[in-house]
UniProtKB/Swiss-Prot annotation:
GO terms for molecular function: chitin binding; endochitinase activity. This is Basic endochitinase. The active site is at residue 130. It comes from the Eukaryota. CDD domains: chitinase_GH19, ChtBD1_GH19_hevein.
């Protein structure tokens, strides 16, 4: 080993000793936030040093999910999103979806091909339910009408709650917008901070800029908010249920993601139409991607998660 290499190694060793590792075996199996790679040394990042040889989790082999979901697949999944009757006509494009996904490099790139395809299917299924324009006898069935809506329908309120960190801007409303129908000032604030956009003062960017709109949905998907894990960690196997989770019936699978998103309304109540609708989208998209569904698709017998920042607000 050369002199400078030895010096660099010693300095790195001192740094590592003087600070706590962030992820992997060095941190009790913790995964990195935002889908970042966990290096063999237990640090989070998105470069080859973190995602390459020895990477412990969320190891992105490529940031381009277009290899798994082509434009034609995307258009087939969201077949009727551009119907004249859909308020979101022309907004939700494949290019915006791919561009936004690249800002979250762990999405659709974590795990084996089956896991990666399931994550894409699960994300599009859950967001399709939130934006669906379908009905039971709709052309091509109810699960071909995802991404029809852009803004919350009816006469939504301001969705403003007192917040020292994310105070509401005068005249702004924080009702549901975009793929995940993000709501409330504090969620707009957190999402905006994560993607580098002031959404507290400019919430309608979620309904006028398609890339920003998709990014808010990916932010929600990739971000754990205690006591809830992230949707990403659940679908990719990065979440291990605690004893309390198991007692509550919360086992890894698509059903827990529904619990994360709207468990207080939909879960633990037996068979409810909303849960079945989400599953219907998921199965159709898995079929298009030619991947199996996995286990535990519903949350019929799951108790909802406890209080969290995103609980039942989206």
């Amino acid at each position: 080993m050369g002199l400078w290499a030895l010096v660099a190694f010693c300095l790195l060793s001192l740094i590592l000793v003087g600070s706590a590792e962030q992820c992997g075996g060095q941190a009790g199996g913790r995964v990195c936030p935002g889908g970042a790679c966990c290096s063999k040394f237990g640090w989070c990042g998105n470069t080859a040093d973190y995602c390459g040889s020895g990477c412990q989790s969320q190891c992105s082999s490529t940031g381009d999910i277009g290899q798994l979901i082509t434009r034609s697949m995307f258009n087939d999944m969201l077949k009727h999103r551009n119907e004249g009757s859909c308020p979101g006509k022309g907004f939700y494009t494949y290019d915006a979806f791919i561009a936004a996904a690249k800002a979250f490099p762990g999405f659709g790139t974590t795990g084996d091909t089956t896991t990666r395809k399931r994550e894409i299917a699960a994300f599009l299924a859950q967001t399709s339910h939130e934006t669906t324009g379908g009905w039971a006898s709709a052309p091509d069935g109810p699960y071909a009408w995802g991404y029809c809506y852009l803004r919350e329908q009816g006469s939504p309120g301001a969705y403003c709650v007192p917040s020292a960190q994310w105070p509401c801007a005068a005249g702004r409303k924080y009702y549901g917008r975009g793929p995940i129908q993000i709501s409330y000032n504090y969620n707009y604030g957190q999402a905006g901070k994560a993607i580098g956009v002031d959404l507290v003062n400019n919430p309608d960017l979620v309904a006028t800029d398609a890339v920003i709109s998709f990014k808010t949905a990916f932010w929600f998907w990739m971000t754990p908010q205690s006591p809830k894990p992230s949707c990403h960690n659940v679908i990719t196997g990065g979440w291990t249920p605690s004893g309390a989770d198991r007692s509550a019936g919360r086992l890894p699978g698509f059903g827990v993601i529904t619990n994360i998103i709207n468990g207080g309304v939909e879960c633990g109540k037996g068979v409810v139409p909303q849960v079945q609708d989400r599953i219907g989208f998921y199965k159709r998209y898995c079929d298009i991607l030619r991947v199996s569904y996995g286990n535990n698709l519903d949350c019929n017998n799951q108790r909802p998660f406890g209080s969290g920042l995103l609980l039942d607000t989206i």
